[in-house]
C-alpha cells in the first residue's frame, strides 16, 4: 500500500513517497509516515525529490553551497510517484556514501577548515551519523526519549577530539553566556529531561553528532530545513534552520568562530597594552609577559580554542611594545636635537623679537601721535563751532543760521517746553531761564560778527564731518542727504512725497506725542542741571534781587557757556552731579579792580583743560546720524576721540 506525505520546510516542500511492506500500524509525526516496527533503519522509505522552486539541489540544511549535499540530476528529476525498494535503496546508498565522508570533513574542521577558513561563509557542514551504531535497543521514536537514558556506549561516542571542548565549555558556560547558559549547564548536570538536551547541545559544540537530535517529541526528517527544533529562546542565534539571527555565542557554527578570529586580527595592541601594564603592576615581577597577555586576552574571547591566536596576539603585543620603545628612544633623540637647535637659535630669535618689539612700539607711537593731533584739531573745531552756533539749551536745538534760531524761539515747540518747565519750577526761575537763553543768543550773534569768512567756515565744518571724502571712488560710496524721524527712529529719503506720507501715518503721530512728553521731561532735567551750577545760581540770586546778572565779566560768561554745553551733552539726571563736581576745577571769578588801577586781562585758559563740546547733545546725537552739520559724535568716533 502506498502513502504520500508532505514535509513543510521554511523554503521548500518535500514530497515523500514510500511503500509499506508490512502490516504493522504506523504513527504520523508530521514528517511523513514512520514505520514503528522492529526495522529502525531507513531502508523502507522511498523519497521523491520533486521541488516546487526551480528544482534546487539544496535540501534545507541551512548551509552554504560548498557544504550542501548535491544530488545527481537523475535523482533530482526522478518520478515523484515512483515506488519500490529499488529506488529507495539507491537513494539511501547515496546518502550513506555522504555519511561515510563525514569523518574526513571532521578532520578538516578541526584543522581550521571550518573554524576560520572553511568554504562556507555562513554555516557549518551538517554533522550526522548512523544512529544505529550507537543507540540502544530501546524504541528510538518514543516521545519521552532523552539523554539521561542513553547507553554507556553513547557516552563513549564523545571520547576523542571533542573532550577538551566539552570540559572547557562546561566550566565556562556561566561566565560566557550569562544566566541562561548557567541554567542550561545546571540542567545538563542535574539530569532534567528537557533542559539536559539543551545544555548538552550547547555545552558540546558538535552540532548534532552522535545525538540524532533527541529531546524533542519527534525526529526531524533527513531532508527537513529545520534540523534543530525551533524554540523561542534560540531565535537571535546564527546557524542553521531555526537560528536566524546573529552569531552571539560565537561557537558551534563555523561563521561565529571565523568572525571571532577576524575580530582577534583586527584588535590593536593598545587593547592589550593597558591590561598588561595593570597585570604587571598588580602581579609578581617574575611572571612572564606571554602569560599575562594570554590571561588578559582570554577575557575577550568566546572560546578557549584560540591558543594559536592568543600566541599571535602576544607576539604582536611584544613586537608592538618593542617598536614603541624604539620610537620613544628615537623621539627622545629627536627632542634632544631639537632642544639643542632651539638653544643654539635662542639668541638670534631674541634679537629678532627685540627688533619686532621696537618696530611695533614705533608704530604705536606714530598712531598715538596721530590720534593726539586729530584730537587737537577736533577740539579747535569744536571751540569754533561753539562760538558761531546758536543753541537753545532746554529744547536741545542747534543751528548755524540766525533766521532759523529766531524761528525756533517763536515756535510752538519752544514755548511748550518753557511752559512745562514753568509748571515744575517757580515763575521767576522760569523767567530767568528764558532771559538766559535770549541773552546767550545775543552774545552768539556778537561773536559771529568777529569772524571774517563765516560762510566759508560753516562749509569747512560740513566738509570735515563728511567721512566719505576719505573713501576711494572704486568703493562707490558717497554722502547722501536724508531726513531722520527721531520719534520713529527712521531715515527717510529727501523727497517731499515720501516725507509727507510718513508724517500722516498713525504710527508717526502716536510716536511723536510720546516723544514730545519725553522731550519736556528732559528739558526739565536740563534746566535743573543748569540752575545747580554755582555761577548760574549766583546770577539767579542777583536776578531775584532785581539786578541784571547778564552784564558780568565776559570770561565768566564763557565759563557758564561751557558748563551749559556740558549739561546739554548729558541730558540726564547725572548731569547735575557732574556739573557740581566740575565746579571746583574751574578758575575763580576775578575780583573787581580798585578805581584808578589797571590790571592786565587774565590769560585765556589752556586748550587742553577744556572739554570738547559737540554740535548736539548726547540725547539727540544718536538720532540725527547723517544730517549735515549735526553729526559730531560720529566724527569724534572716526577721529579717535576720547
Swiss-Prot record:
<feature type="modified residue" description="N6-acetyllysine">
    <location>
        <position position="258"/>
    </location>
</feature>
<keyword id="KW-0539">Nucleus</keyword>
<keyword id="KW-0479">Metal-binding</keyword>
<dbReference type="InterPro" id="IPR034736">
    <property type="entry name" value="ZF_C2H2_AKAP95"/>
</dbReference>
<dbReference type="GO" id="GO:0010793">
    <property type="term" value="P:regulation of mRNA export from nucleus"/>
</dbReference>
<feature type="modified residue" description="Asymmetric dimethylarginine; alternate">
    <location>
        <position position="209"/>
    </location>
</feature>
<keyword id="KW-0007">Acetylation</keyword>
<feature type="short sequence motif" description="Nuclear localization signal">
    <location>
        <begin position="363"/>
        <end position="365"/>
    </location>
</feature>
<feature type="short sequence motif" description="Nuclear localization signal">
    <location>
        <begin position="275"/>
        <end position="280"/>
    </location>
</feature>
<feature type="region of interest" description="Sufficient for activation of CTE-mediated expression">
    <location>
        <begin position="1"/>
        <end position="269"/>
    </location>
</feature>
<keyword id="KW-0963">Cytoplasm</keyword>
<feature type="modified residue" description="Omega-N-methylarginine">
    <location>
        <position position="238"/>
    </location>
</feature>
<dbReference type="GO" id="GO:1990904">
    <property type="term" value="C:ribonucleoprotein complex"/>
</dbReference>
<dbReference type="GO" id="GO:0016605">
    <property type="term" value="C:PML body"/>
</dbReference>
<keyword id="KW-0677">Repeat</keyword>
<comment type="function">
    <text>Could play a role in constitutive transport element (CTE)-mediated gene expression by association with DHX9. Increases CTE-dependent nuclear unspliced mRNA export. Proposed to target PRKACA to the nucleus but does not seem to be implicated in the binding of regulatory subunit II of PKA. May be involved in nuclear envelope breakdown and chromatin condensation. May be involved in anchoring nuclear membranes to chromatin in interphase and in releasing membranes from chromating at mitosis. May regulate the initiation phase of DNA replication when associated with TMPO isoform Beta.</text>
</comment>
<feature type="modified residue" description="Phosphoserine">
    <location>
        <position position="284"/>
    </location>
</feature>
<dbReference type="GO" id="GO:0016607">
    <property type="term" value="C:nuclear speck"/>
</dbReference>
<feature type="short sequence motif" description="Nuclear export signal (NES)">
    <location>
        <begin position="281"/>
        <end position="297"/>
    </location>
</feature>
<dbReference type="GO" id="GO:0016363">
    <property type="term" value="C:nuclear matrix"/>
</dbReference>
<dbReference type="InterPro" id="IPR007071">
    <property type="entry name" value="AKAP95"/>
</dbReference>
<feature type="compositionally biased region" description="Pro residues">
    <location>
        <begin position="585"/>
        <end position="605"/>
    </location>
</feature>
<feature type="modified residue" description="Phosphoserine">
    <location>
        <position position="298"/>
    </location>
</feature>
<keyword id="KW-0804">Transcription</keyword>
<keyword id="KW-0862">Zinc</keyword>
<feature type="compositionally biased region" description="Acidic residues">
    <location>
        <begin position="553"/>
        <end position="564"/>
    </location>
</feature>
<dbReference type="GO" id="GO:0005737">
    <property type="term" value="C:cytoplasm"/>
</dbReference>
<feature type="modified residue" description="Phosphothreonine">
    <location>
        <position position="268"/>
    </location>
</feature>
<feature type="compositionally biased region" description="Basic and acidic residues">
    <location>
        <begin position="338"/>
        <end position="350"/>
    </location>
</feature>
<protein>
    <recommendedName>
        <fullName>A-kinase anchor protein 8-like</fullName>
    </recommendedName>
</protein>
<feature type="zinc finger region" description="C2H2 AKAP95-type 1">
    <location>
        <begin position="392"/>
        <end position="414"/>
    </location>
</feature>
<dbReference type="Pfam" id="PF04988">
    <property type="entry name" value="AKAP95"/>
</dbReference>
<feature type="compositionally biased region" description="Basic and acidic residues">
    <location>
        <begin position="288"/>
        <end position="297"/>
    </location>
</feature>
<feature type="modified residue" description="Omega-N-methylarginine; alternate">
    <location>
        <position position="209"/>
    </location>
</feature>
<feature type="zinc finger region" description="C2H2 AKAP95-type 2">
    <location>
        <begin position="485"/>
        <end position="508"/>
    </location>
</feature>
<comment type="similarity">
    <text>Belongs to the AKAP95 family.</text>
</comment>
<keyword id="KW-0488">Methylation</keyword>
<keyword id="KW-0863">Zinc-finger</keyword>
<feature type="region of interest" description="Disordered">
    <location>
        <begin position="546"/>
        <end position="642"/>
    </location>
</feature>
<feature type="modified residue" description="Omega-N-methylarginine">
    <location>
        <position position="248"/>
    </location>
</feature>
<feature type="compositionally biased region" description="Acidic residues">
    <location>
        <begin position="299"/>
        <end position="315"/>
    </location>
</feature>
<dbReference type="GO" id="GO:0008270">
    <property type="term" value="F:zinc ion binding"/>
</dbReference>
Amino acid at each position: 500500500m502506498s502513502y504520500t506525505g508532505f514535509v513543510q520546510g521554511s523554503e521548500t516542500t518535500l514530497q515523500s513517497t514510500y511503500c509499506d511492506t508490512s502490516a504493522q500500524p504506523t504513527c504520523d509525526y508530521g514528517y511523513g509516515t514512520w514505520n514503528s516496527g522492529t526495522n529502525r533503519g531507513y531502508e523502507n522509505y522511498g523519497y521523491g525529490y520533486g521541488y516546487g522552486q526551480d528544482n534546487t539541489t539544496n535540501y534545507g540544511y541551512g548551509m552554504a553551497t560548498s557544504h550542501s549535499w548535491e544530488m545527481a540530476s537523475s535523482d533530482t528529476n526522478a518520478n515523484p510517484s515512483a515506488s519500490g525498494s529499488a529506488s529507495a535503496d539507491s537513494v539511501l546508498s547515496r546518502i550513506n556514501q555522504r555519511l561515510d565522508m563525514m569523518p574526513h570533513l571532521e578532520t578538516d574542521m578541526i584543522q581550521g577548515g571550518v573554524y576560520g577558513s572553511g568554504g562556507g561563509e555562513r554555516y557549518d557542514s551538517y554533522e550526522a551519523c548512523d544512529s544505529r551504531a550507537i543507540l540502544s535497543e530501546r524504541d528510538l521514536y518514543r516521545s519521552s526519549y532523552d539523554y539521561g537514558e542513553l547507553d554507556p556506549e553513547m557516552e563513549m561516542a564523545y571520547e576523542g577530539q571533542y573532550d577538551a571542548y566539552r570540559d572547557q565549555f562546561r566550566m565556562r558556560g556561566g561566565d560566557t553566556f550569562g544566566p541562561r547558559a548557567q541554567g542550561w549547564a545546571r540542567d545538563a548536570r542535574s539530569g532534567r529531561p528537557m533542559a539536559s538536551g539543551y545544555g548538552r547541545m550547547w555545552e558540546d559544540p558538535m552540532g548534532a553528532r552522535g545525538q540524532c537530535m533527541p529531546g524533542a517529541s519527534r525526529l526531524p526528517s533527513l531532508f527537513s530545513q529545520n534540523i534543530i527544533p525551533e524554540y523561542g529562546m534560540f531565535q537571535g542565534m546564527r546557524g542553521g534552520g531555526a537560528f536566524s539571527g546573529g552569531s552571539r555565542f560565537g561557537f558551534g557554527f563555523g561563521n561565529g568562530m571565523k568572525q571571532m578570529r577576524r575580530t582577534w586580527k583586527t584588535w590593536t595592541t593598545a587593547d592589550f597594552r593597558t591590561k598588561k601594564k595593570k597585570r604587571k603592576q598588580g602581579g609578581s615581577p617574575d611572571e612572564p609577559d606571554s602569560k599575562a597577555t594570554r590571561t588578559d586576552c582570554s577575557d575577550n574571547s568566546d572560546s578557549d580554542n584560540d591558543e594559536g591566536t592568543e600566541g599571535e596576539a602576544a607576539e604582536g603585543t611584544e613586537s608592538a611594545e618593542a617598536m614603541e620603545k624604539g620610537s620613544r628612544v628615537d623621539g627622545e633623540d629627536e627632542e634632544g636635537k631639537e632642544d639643542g637647535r632651539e638653544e643654539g637659535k635662542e639668541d638670534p630669535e631674541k634679537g629678532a623679537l627685540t627688533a619686532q618689539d621696537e618696530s611695533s612700539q614705533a608704530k604705536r607711537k606714530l598712531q598715538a601721535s596721530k590720534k593726539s593731533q586729530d584730537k587737537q584739531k577736533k577740539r579747535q573745531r569744536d571751540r569754533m563751532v561753539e562760538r558761531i552756533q546758536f543753541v537753545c539749551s532746554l529744547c536741545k536745538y542747534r543751528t548755524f543760521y540766525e533766521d532759523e534760531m529766531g524761528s525756533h524761539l517763536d515756535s510752538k515747540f519752544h514755548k511748550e517746553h518753557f511752559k512745562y518747565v514753568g509748571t515744575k519750577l517757580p515763575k521767576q526761575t522760569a523767567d530767568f531761564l528764558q532771559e538766559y537763553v535770549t541773552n546767550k543768543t545775543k552774545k552768539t550773534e556778537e561773536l559771529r560778527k568777529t569772524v571774517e569768512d563765516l560762510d566759508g567756515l560753516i562749509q569747512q565744518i560740513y566738509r570735515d564731518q563728511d567721512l566719505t571724502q576719505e573713501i576711494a571712488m572704486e568703493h562707490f560710496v558717497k554722502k547722501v542727504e536724508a531726513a531722520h524721524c527721531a520719534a520713529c527712529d527712521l531715515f527717510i529719503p529727501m523727497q517731499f512725497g515720501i516725507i509727507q506720507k510718513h508724517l500722516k501715518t498713525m504710527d508717526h503721530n502716536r510716536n511723536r506725542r510720546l516723544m514730545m512728553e519725553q522731550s519736556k521731561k528732559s528739558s526739565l532735567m536740563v534746566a535743573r542741571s543748569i540752575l545747580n551750577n554755582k555761577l548760574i545760581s549766583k546770577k539767579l540770586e542777583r536776578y531775584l534781587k532785581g539786578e541784571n546778572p547778564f552784564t558780568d565779566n565776559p570770561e565768566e560768561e564763557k565759563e557758564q557757556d561751557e558748563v551749559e554745553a556740558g549739561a546739554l551733552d548729558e541730558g540726564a539726571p547725572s548731569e547735575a552731579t557732574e556739573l557740581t563736581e566740575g565746579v571746583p576745577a574751574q578758575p575763580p571769578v576775578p575780583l573787581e579792580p580798585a578805581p584808578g588801577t589797571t590790571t592786565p586781562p587774565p590769560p585765556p585758559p589752556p586748550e587742553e583743560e577744556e572739554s570738547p563740546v559737540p554740535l548736539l547733545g548726547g540725547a539727540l546725537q544718536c538720532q540725527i546720524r547723517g544730517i549735515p552739520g549735526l553729526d559730531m559724535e560720529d566724527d569724534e568716533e572716526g577721529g579717535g576721540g576720547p
